[in-house]
């Protein structure tokens, strides 16, 4: 049995290893929850044996040493971290400790904030001008990232307003919105660059670039949450008051900051934020709860590495560790072959996860994944679980290599990978049952032809029994044939036939989307329909003409052109029309004849709208003569920004494009 000294040494060594990977290499190997567990275990042992605490124990400091590639900045006021609580009982115990230590009848109010999952930074302003910025580093010394921070548009280079202190050190979090993270990884996959595991790693990697020009291209943003140095001026005597003052001076502060009058209100805030978490547009891993009164903060003071007046109330972990039992390969509607990890089931963020996507062969190679490996699984909101990284330090001896198939696992056709593309595809086309099933499921889906009651299991049976080969065959189905399927009685069968009949009346845009042309999503389908107006015009369009449609480049134009050039596709379309699929004749809109503030303008919608759906907004804008595009470019005239707008808003601001909010859009639509 190990001695206490041996246990302490092993825990400290393990924690230092993971601190180095997290803070210095920006390549964490274990989830935050596992690190927290190890730290709690060490702290509990040291509490029982205080005589064995060493000055260099991970419990006695904040982070890790800075990179040698950057010059260093010493923090005049140490940047401490926060203690954590993980459940209501622990928070209520913290609340009681605060009340007991204050020993007065004076009421305690709490300033509650989001715990952003980014990189903590310190920004020093002298006479209102940004002069330096640093990472937290080890809490006393950080890396000089001034040049990089100056590229972040959310951070003012000069404060504005009155009574700005002579020296003011603002502390906050640099982070990457989810839309920006997805765009960075999408670009990286296309160009063969580094793919980041999560937005926090992407933010850290972006901020710690030696070349600020690279940082400038990344849509980083910032919220401030505190103050370090304060000289030659005064600030309000409450934490919330200080944040509101920062906002007046031009510093970004989260609009989710809330003042709570009691522990019960704090818990309500925690649960509300947890509920809203999937729609925020950026990653958080909990809430931060601070005593609002500065006088009470001073009275409570600090322990070695954290304040007694604040705590981080963390959400259930979105990352967990488990083992890869096997890797299987699925075939999608376009023939894309996707490797899927079959996992030892594990609960992640309240959901039992047994599968995780591995995307493609490049991703498997990047991860260095082998069957049998211990891996970190991440699940955020409704996102499909994914493997974040392999825990190489705990790799079993009997792992096996993942072998990518050379033939389709469903139909046996050759698998090909086009040069420059990450995805491998089955060449079987509609002779491949998997592709046929997925194509039909897409065709009947809600945003495509919207065939009510035609679920995945019905499609599976229709293909397996060879009742249906193409989308046109769906409209030839009879109630009698459908009753031959499992769990399909006469009434249900007739309902499906009625739904198919109803689905024949559609729109040109929905029809195009339902066809499943590669790279043609809803927005592109709507753009093609609006630009060409008729199926005949679209079928006859050249690649050059197709590229005149907003957001259609050479790749998408080629896919569309090739689709209509294929005789079998044209035959299916002819059959669909013969079965009665139709849509209204196009209304030709001449933007010059429309008296509208949107007429002739290229408009981009970003963020979520609260008063109307995006589809309704797009339709209304098109009616008023606008061209609705899916991405921001120099050709964009106007951006409409809803809640949680991300990288599109940032790019619009960078290009100096006019931006309005939903309220102004509704006003203009009404005018």
UniProtKB/Swiss-Prot annotation:
Disulfide bonds: none
GO biological process: DNA repair; DNA replication
SUPFAM superfamilies given in the database record: BRCT domain, DNA ligase/mRNA capping enzyme, catalytic domain, Nucleic acid-binding proteins, RuvA domain 2-like
Domain annotation BRCT: ranges: 593-671
Keyword DNA repair: yes
Record-annotated active site: 115
Gene Ontology molecular function: DNA binding; DNA ligase (NAD+) activity; metal ion binding
Keyword DNA-binding belongs to the record: no
Functional description taken from the UniProt entry: DNA ligase that catalyzes the formation of phosphodiester linkages between 5'-phosphoryl and 3'-hydroxyl groups in double-stranded DNA using NAD as a coenzyme and as the energy source for the reaction. It is essential for DNA replication and repair of damaged DNA.
Record-stated family: Belongs to the NAD-dependent DNA ligase family. LigA subfamily.
Name of the protein this chain belongs to: DNA ligase
Organism: Escherichia coli O6:K15:H31 (strain 536 / UPEC)
Native organism taxonomy: Bacteria, Pseudomonadati, Pseudomonadota, Gammaproteobacteria, Enterobacterales
Gene symbol of the encoding locus: ligA
């Amino acid at each position: 049995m190990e001695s206490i000294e041996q246990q302490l040494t092993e825990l400290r060594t393990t924690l230092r290893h993971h601190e180095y990977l997290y803070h210095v290499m920006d390549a964490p190997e274990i989830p935050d929850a596992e690190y927290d567990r190890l730290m709690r275990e060490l702290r509990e042992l040291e509490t029982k044996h205080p005589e064995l605490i060493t000055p260099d124990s991970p419990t006695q400091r904040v982070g890790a040493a800075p990179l040698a590639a950057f010059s260093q900045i010493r923090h005049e006021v140490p940047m401490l971290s926060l203690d954590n609580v993980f459940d209501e009982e622990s928070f209520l115990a913290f609340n009681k400790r605060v009340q007991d230590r204050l020993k007065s009848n004076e009421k305690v109010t709490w300033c509650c904030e989001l715990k952003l999952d980014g990189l903590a930074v310190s920004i020093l302003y002298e006479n209102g001008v940004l002069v330096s910025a640093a990472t937290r580093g080890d809490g006393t010394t950080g890396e000089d990232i001034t040049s990089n921070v100056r590229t972040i548009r959310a951070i003012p280079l000069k404060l504005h307003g009155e009574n700005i202190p002579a020296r003011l050190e603002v502390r906050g979090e640099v982070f990457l919105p989810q839309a920006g993270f997805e765009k960075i990884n999408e670009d990286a996959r296309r160009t063969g660059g580094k793919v980041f595991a999560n937005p926090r790693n992407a933010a850290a990697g972006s901020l710690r670039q030696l070349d600020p020009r690279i940082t400038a291209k990344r849509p980083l943003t910032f919220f401030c949450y505190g103050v370090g140095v304060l000289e030659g001026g005064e600030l309000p005597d409450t934490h919330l008051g200080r944040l509101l003052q920062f906002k007046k001076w031009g510093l970004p502060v989260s609009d989710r900051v809330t003042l709570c009058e009691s522990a019960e209100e704090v818990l309500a805030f925690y649960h509300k934020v947890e509920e809203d978490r999937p729609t925020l547009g950026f990653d958080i891993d909990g809430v931060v709860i601070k005593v609002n009164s500065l006088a009470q903060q001073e009275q409570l003071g600090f322990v070695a590495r954290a304040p007694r007046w604040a705590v981080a109330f963390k959400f259930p972990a979105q990352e967990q560790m488990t083992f890869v039992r096997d890797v299987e390969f699925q075939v999608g509607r376009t023939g894309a072959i996707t490797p899927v990890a079959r996992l030892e089931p594990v609960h992640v963020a309240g959901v039992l996860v047994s599968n995780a996507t591995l995307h493609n062969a490049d991703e498997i190679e990047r991860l260095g994944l082998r069957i049998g490996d211990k891996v970190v699984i991440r699940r955020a909101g409704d996102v499909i679980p994914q493997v974040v990284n392999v825990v190489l330090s705990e790799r079993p001896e009997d792992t096996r290599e993942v072998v990518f198939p050379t033939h389709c696992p469903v139909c046996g056709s050759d698998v090909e990978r086009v040069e420059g593309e990450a995805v491998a595809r089955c060449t079987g086309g509609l002779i491949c049952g998997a592709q046929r099933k997925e194509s039909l499921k897409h065709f009947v889906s809600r945003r495509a032809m919207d065939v009510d009651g035609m679920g995945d299991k019905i499609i599976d049976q229709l293909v397996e029994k060879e009742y249906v080969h193409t989308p046109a065959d769906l409209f030839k189905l009879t109630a009698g044939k459908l009753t031959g399927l499992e769990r399909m009685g006469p009434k249900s069968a007739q309902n499906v036939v009625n739904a198919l009949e109803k689905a024949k009346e559609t729109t040109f845009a929905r029809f195009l989307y339902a066809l499943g042309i590669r790279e043609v999503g809803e927005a592109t389908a709507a753009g093609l329909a609006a630009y060409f107006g008729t199926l005949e015009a679209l079928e006859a369009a050249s690649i050059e003409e197709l590229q005149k449609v907003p957001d259609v480049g050479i790749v998408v134009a080629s896919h569309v052109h090739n689709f209509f050039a294929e005789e079998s596709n044209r035959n299916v379309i002819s059959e669909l029309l013969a079965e009665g699929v139709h849509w209204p004749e196009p209304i030709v809109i001449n933007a010059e004849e429309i008296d509208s503030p949107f007429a002739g303008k290229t408009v981009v919608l970003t963020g979520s709208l609260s008063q109307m759906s995006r589809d309704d907004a797009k339709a209304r804008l098109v009616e008023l003569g606008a061209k609705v595009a899916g991405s921001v470019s120099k050709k964009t005239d106007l951006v409409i920004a809803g809640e949680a707008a991300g990288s599109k808003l940032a790019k619009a601001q960078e290009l100096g494009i006019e931006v309005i909010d939903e309220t102004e859009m509704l006003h203009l639509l009404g005018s």
